[in-house]
């Protein structure tokens, strides 16, 4: 069995790729970074350091190869693929539409009727379904029957904290990564048109929407708020931030607020189950050996402030269900304070706030009604955070 993984980044190398190899697939990474592609093909292996508060061990991933996405012979080289997984990031996912449209054409023209499963592993709601819709818009109608019959687009939720390992002193790309032991990969069991791939660690569910928002509203929400608050104080890593009692209380409070939304919205998680889930995530954040940079977690703040992302989406639902949201508002205010001259989105956000104000940003970027009282409340927290430490 052959598998491709698009995106030879942290999640690809540290989570999805190793599971595919462990499950018996021949794995090829596809990436738009020629240097990473060359490094993978040169070494054909890399190390994963698994760390916890009382353990650390190294595993070596072997027999890996990679191909540059703009290789002129890529469609020939990846023929007869059985499984494609994707973790390229929110901003890059749409760039794959043209690639997959051409791949489908190539499969038809070469009489390739091997069933293909495409699984999106992104922090985007129903990412694979959206990808399929966009491909169909581009793909001529005469090819739609082939797509619908032979290709499964499967949505999933992935959860594992993966960090780049320490840089080495050579000019070579350091492929090694550092990961936590915890992992979760849940896929929508209703979207497979043919036999499900036998992948170790994959969980099949028909409640994917609930699991997606559980992860987004809890891990991603808490992660982001811890990062933005930590940066205000001057911390560097997630574990430093979450060990600060004041930050911990706000993050824990925000997670409980978003948790009340999930319990009310889905009637699927119990209070005790979700409390344990929150506490498990907080313990993961406290892993002092997982040096997860606050700037890495906080990067691309405009994306994180969109209405369907980790900060605004749970806030909107607290309004809908008339639930508490003070800690979520504090987290959003901290995100608005984010400054990083190397982050294009952070610079845009800063300029928008200076020139247009908070109300404009939350209306334009977050699609919040400018008349909402919470905008004034977020503005108050923002002004406090900008003047003094928390």
From Swiss-Prot:
Ligand binding (NAD(+)): 3-14
Q: Which GO terms describe its molecular function?
A: mannitol-1-phosphate 5-dehydrogenase activity
Q: Enzyme class, one word? A: oxidoreductase
What InterPro entries does this protein's entry cite?
6-PGluconate_DH-like_C_sf, 6PGD_dom2, Mannitol_1_phos_5_DH, Mannitol_DH, Mannitol_DH_C, Mannitol_DH_N, NAD(P)-bd_dom_sf
**Known catalysed reaction(s)?**
D-mannitol 1-phosphate + NAD(+) = beta-D-fructose 6-phosphate + NADH + H(+)
Source superkingdom: Bacteria
One protein family per Pfam = Mannitol_dh_C
Kindly state which keywords UniProt assigns to this record, in alphabetical order: NAD, Oxidoreductase
Q: Please list the GO biological process terms of this entry.
A: mannitol catabolic process
Q: What is its EC number?
A: 1.1.1.17
Q: Name one GO cellular component term.
A: cytosol
The similarity annotation says: Belongs to the mannitol dehydrogenase family.
Name of the featured protein: Mannitol-1-phosphate 5-dehydrogenase
